[in-house]
């Protein structure tokens, strides 16, 4: 619903005039063309580092792990003002089948930009960059710094954002441009945690199957118990579907390398990969205790039931290696109110969702690390969609609006 609102000031108009929608689309398309799956972000980071430097920002490549890089840039203020981070991750979701075109060759149709990675979340990265460049090109004098963090590794625990915070980019506030919609500001979401459960058996030839212990059969019992498990928690009515968990992968075979040949041999090792979403009453420690309690009960019933819990998961598994805490940032925080106010200025509307939006608030993201570091933050980014992870797209009107809102928010924060 439209509401009374103040029009942009002359200074705001000066910044907004430096946002070229064609340039926004070109940058987004360039990013689509650079695949940057989790652990493979470096080529995209290097491209961005060069781009940001060419545009006049103070940019650097940070090596968060050997050979794994991310790009971070700063628009320096004159001093004495508040600093703000505009944050987006460059690692992208796994590629699903079913695409109707080449997923790394962007195309536009019906006001939507298509391409793999654009939704989660290269459109958000684009908005962050173009917002900062609008400020620089406007010539407006800022006292505080504006940081653009194009981080790696959000999809496996967010170690890129942690690295940025701990290596020179701790700001007074932050906006993470996750793709939840240009009229949505999220401040509350679940925590996330990955772990691996192993069951151990004893391999024997099928001719002596009775003498073996089948790790796969034991895992079937374990999965049934895990799915029925009641995780210890205090109910949060704003997140009614939490806690929740998902057994996402199961593999069993011979030995810890899962030799899948020789189906005539009883499996002696089986693993299941589990993701858990939880609220602020829970932690990694409480969840581990719940898993042990549940699996210990199976072991008490069955002397041949042997298990291990792997946490943190080995890096080679590509899972999150941290228990990312749930977040509940007060909507009264200045950065939240700035985004809300600038959305109203540009659209004439209040946000459709403020604080919690379901199911989006059941997802984890890097505001976890910012908030735990004492940095007030919120989620605000351009929305779009996908069908079973193929033909992923972003709504261009949302991308343009978010770019403008972020530019005015950074202007207000760093003025």
Predicted regions and their residues:
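Metal-dependent amide/peptide-bond hydrolase catalytic core
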Residues: 1-9, 193-415
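Acidic/His- and Gly-rich active-site-bordering loop/insert found
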Residues: 2-114, 137-142
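A short linear hydrophobic-aromatic micro-motif
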Residues: 57-61, 184, 354-357
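A structural signal for isolated positions on well-ordered beta-strands in alpha/beta enzyme cores
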Residues: 60, 85, 147-149, 308
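Short acidic loop-to-helix transition motifs that present clustered carboxylates
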Residues: 65-69, 157, 181-182, 363-364
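A short, acidic/glycine-rich surface segment
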Residues: 93-95, 158-160, 182-185, 231-234, ...
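Fold-level recognition of mixed alpha/beta catalytic cores in primary-metabolism enzymes, strongest
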Residues: 113, 118-119, 123-228, 237, ...
């Amino acid at each position: 619903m439209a509401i009374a609102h103040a029009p942009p000031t002359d200074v705001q108009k000066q910044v907004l005039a430096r946002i070229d929608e064609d340039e926004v689309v070109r940058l987004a398309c360039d990013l689509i063309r650079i695949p940057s799956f989790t652990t493979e972000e470096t080529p995209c980071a290097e491209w961005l580092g060069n781009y940001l430097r060419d545009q006049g920002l103070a940019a650097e490549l940070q090596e968060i792990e050997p050979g794994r890089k991310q790009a971070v840039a700063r628009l320096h203020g004159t001093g004495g003002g508040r600093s703000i981070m505009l944050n987006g991750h460059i690692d992208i979701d796994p590629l699903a089948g079913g695409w109707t075109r080449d997923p790394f060759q962007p195309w536009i149709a019906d006001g939507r930009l298509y391409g793999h990675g654009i939704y989660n979340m290269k459109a958000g990265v684009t908005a962050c960059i173009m917002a900062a460049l609008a400020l620089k090109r406007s010539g407006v004098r800022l006292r505080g710094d504006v940081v653009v963090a194009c981080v790696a590794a959000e999809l496996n625990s967010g170690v890129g954002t942690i690295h940025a915070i701990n290596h020179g980019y701790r700001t007074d506030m932050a906006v993470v441009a996750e793709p939840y919609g240009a009229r949505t500001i999220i401040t509350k979401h679940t925590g996330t945690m990955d772990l691996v459960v192993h069951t151990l058996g004893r391999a024997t030839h099928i001719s002596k199957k009775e003498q073996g212990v089948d790790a796969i059969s034991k895992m079937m019992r374990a999965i049934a118990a895990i799915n029925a498990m009641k995780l210890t928690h205090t109910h949060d009515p704003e997140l009614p579907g939490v806690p929740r968990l998902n057994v996402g992968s199961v593999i069993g075979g011979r030995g810890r390398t899962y030799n899948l040949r020789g189906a005539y041999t009883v499996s002696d090792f089986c693993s299941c990969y589990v993701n858990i979403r939880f609220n602020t009453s829970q932690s990694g420690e409480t969840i581990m205790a719940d898993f042990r309690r549940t699996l210990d009960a199976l072991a008490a019933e069955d002397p041949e039931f042997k298990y291990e819990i792997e946490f943190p998961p080995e890096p080679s598994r590509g899972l999150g290696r941290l228990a990312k805490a749930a977040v509940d940032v007060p909507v009264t925080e200045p950065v939240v109110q700035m985004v809300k106010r600038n959305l109203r200025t540009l659209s004439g509307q209040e946000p459709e969702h403020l604080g919690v939006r379901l199911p989006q608030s059941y997802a984890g993201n890097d505001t976890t690390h910012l908030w735990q570091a004492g940095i007030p933050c919120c989620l605000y980014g351009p929305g779009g969609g996908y069908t079973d992870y193929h033909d992923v797209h972003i709504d261009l009107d949302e991308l343009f609006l978010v770019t403008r809102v972020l530019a005015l928010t950074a202007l207000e924060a760093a003025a």
